[in-house]
A protein has these predicted regions:
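AMP-forming adenylation/ATP pyrophosphatase catalytic core
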Residues: 122-130, 134-349, 353-355, 360
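ATP-dependent adenylation/nucleotidyltransferase module used to activate substrates
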Residues: 1-153, 180, 254, 344, ...
Length: 361
């Protein structure tokens, strides 16, 4: 089988290419150029750097497979960077990696695979695609410590047959051992933790450089008493504790961001919790609505048991209500994933614009 391998220059995608080649597949390596400096150069820090591209090229040469770097900077800028800035300007917390998977990577990789006569696209994500009866489901990886199903929740049923996750049953230590046995230079390369277009810089400076947040505003408590000032709502996210004025020795958190009135509300941790929530833009991958679920609101966080209340969606936003047994703090994040069953298989794709953390009743 001819397979396009999405190569990031890291150990995971390197091993995917190596494993598929050793299994007799016709492998083609492709790296996306997503972000560039003012002179068209690839960034030096973060992920998707010039060094990463060079590492991917050397791995491809070691494995003796064709390798290409394709330029998708325009698509990335429009769909990911603009979205990143827009979300912060609305007082919401974006997830650029999820947005990149949704709007850029998988669509373009699948399209490129078709052009190269490849039957599948393989990536180094830790997740599994499992057949159940006549449909495919997205499951968590066996190695839960690195499970990445959360950042893949946007994958729709029509895309799953075109994708392969060879690392779904392999642990990270095993991946590094395989890389070393294949003589790949990425065997002990550290995983990137940075936002590719921000790197090690403060995201606030990046956002403020792209939109005018020059007007200062007030930091207030839940009774609207002024307790401080801020230089722009983009510097805050709901649930944030660092840099928040305290009081009476108790930590304070951002509980609400009022963009229209340029106010940042702060309160106690208890002010962030509720049992009832509204979620928007819910779609069910296999068309079946599950009731007893668990929800994950950020990468590598614990699942929270919840109940999805069935009923007709409100308007075109596909709005649904759900609740938890105990009061929880589910913040105003852009992305969340639902899971169902003992194996935590992935019945629902959520591409929500935001959580609305408010009581339903």
């Amino acid at each position: 089988m001819r397979i396009l391998v999405a190569m990031s220059g890291g150990v995971d995608s390197s091993v995917v290419a190596g494993l598929l080649k050793s299994q007799g597949h016709d492998v083609i390596g492709v790296t996306m150029k997503l972000w560039e400096g003012p002179n068209g150069e690839m960034p030096e820090t973060g992920c998707c750097t010039a060094a990463d591209s060079e590492d991917a090229r050397k791995v491809a040469a070691k494995l003796d497979i064709p390798y290409y770097v394709l330029d998708y900077t325009a698509s990335f800028s429009e769909n990911v960077i603009d979205n990143f800035v827009d979300m912060y300007s609305q007082g919401l917390t974006p997830n650029p990696c999820v947005e990149c998977n949704r709007s850029v990577k998988f669509d373009h990789f699948i399209d490129q695979a078709k052009k190269l006569n490849c039957e599948k696209v393989a990536t180094g994500h830790y997740a599994k695609i499992v057949r159940s009866n006549d449909s495919l489901e997205l499951h968590k990886a066996d190695y839960l410590e690195k499970d990445q199903s959360y950042v893949l929740h946007m994958l729709t049923a029509d895309k799953l047959p075109k994708i392969d996750f060879p690392l779904g049953t392999i642990s990270k230590p095993e991946v590094r051992q395989i890389a070393a046995s294949l003589g790949l230079k990425t065997a002990f390369k550290k995983d990137s933790q940075d936002i590719c277009f921000v790197g090690k810089k403060d995201y606030r400076n990046f956002v403020s450089s792209r939109i005018d947040f020059s007007s200062s505003g007030d930091i207030v408590d839940k009774d609207d008493n002024i307790i401080g000032t801020h230089e722009g709502v983009h510097e805050f996210t709901v649930g944030q504790r660092k840099g928040i004025p305290g009081g009476q020795g108790q930590p304070k958190y951002v509980t609400k961001i009022d963009v229209e009135n340029n106010k940042v509300f702060i309160g106690s941790k208890a002010d962030l919790t509720t049992k009832n929530f509204i979620i928007e833009d819910v779609s069910f991958v296999n068309g079946e609505e599950y009731e007893n679920l668990s929800i994950q609101t950020r990468y590598n966080s614990h699942d929270i048991p919840c109940k999805l209340h069935k009923g007709k969606s409100e308007s075109a936003l596909q709005r649904r209500s759900f609740s938890t047994k105990k009061e929880r703090s589910l913040l105003a994040r852009k992305e969340s994933s639902f899971y169902s069953g003992k194996e935590r298989f992935f019945p629902i794709k959520k591409s929500a614009h935001f959580f609305k953390k408010r009581a339903l009743f």
